[in-house]
Swiss-Prot record:
It comes from Staphylococcus aureus (strain MRSA252). The PTS EIIA type-2 domain is phosphorylated by phospho-HPr on a histidyl residue. Then, it transfers the phosphoryl group to the PTS EIIB type-2 domain. It is found in: Cytoplasm. Its main location: cytoplasm. Transmembrane segments: none annotated. The lineage of its organism: Bacteria, Bacillati, Bacillota, Bacilli, Bacillales. It comes from the Bacteria. GO terms for biological process: phosphoenolpyruvate-dependent sugar phosphotransferase system. The active site is at residue 63. The modification Phosphohistidine is found at residue 63. This is Mannitol-specific phosphotransferase enzyme IIA component. The phosphoenolpyruvate-dependent sugar phosphotransferase system (sugar PTS), a major carbohydrate active transport system, catalyzes the phosphorylation of incoming sugar substrates concomitantly with their translocation across the cell membrane. The enzyme II CmtAB PTS system is involved in D-mannitol transport. GO terms for cellular component: cytoplasm; plasma membrane.
Length: 144
């Protein structure tokens, strides 16, 4: 999974004022990496209206609706580290992982991310990381 994280798609010390702004930043990074079309960003917002993507332990995993599968060019991940946190439906989120999965791969990606974040120590390491490499290492160790 760590191979889907490029250093260009890991953003440290992000400051956002809202959940919507965080979704837009994550979605734009997926667009910029060539993983999705622009329409996918709206699909991420649409999903959030139906069900929150807050996963617990300070993590949210925004992703598009099932109808948005046609907007996914290839699988991709982006990570926003938000040390100050952002309100996410009444919860504090410090890490946003935007995902786009091609050919049903999003369920596997969701599962691997959730497993990594199920350990509070991993969450702390990601929130406190000073480089993209440190964050990638947490995922590599969890995936081993």
């Amino acid at each position: 999974m760590s191979e889907l994280f490029s250093n260009d798609n890991i953003f440290l010390n992000v400051n956002v004022n809202s959940q919507n702004e965080a979704i837009e930043k994550a979605g734009k990074a997926l667009v910029d990496s060539g993983a999705v079309t622009d329409a996918y960003i709206q699909a991420m917002k649409d999903r959030e209206q139906v069900v929150s993507t807050f996963m617990g332990n300070g993590l949210a995993i925004p992703h598009g609706t099932d109808e948005a599968k046609t907007n996914v060019i290839h699988s991709g991940l982006t990570l926003l580290q938000i040390p100050e946190g952002v309100d996410w439906d009444g919860e504090v989120v410090k890490v946003v992982v935007g995902i786009a999965g091609k050919d049903g791969e999003h369920l596997d990606l969701l599962s691997k991310i959730a497993i990594t974040f199920s350990e509070e120590g991993n969450v702390d390491r990601i929130v406190q990381a000073k480089s993209a490499e440190e964050i990638k290492q947490v995922f590599e160790e969890a995936d081993a």
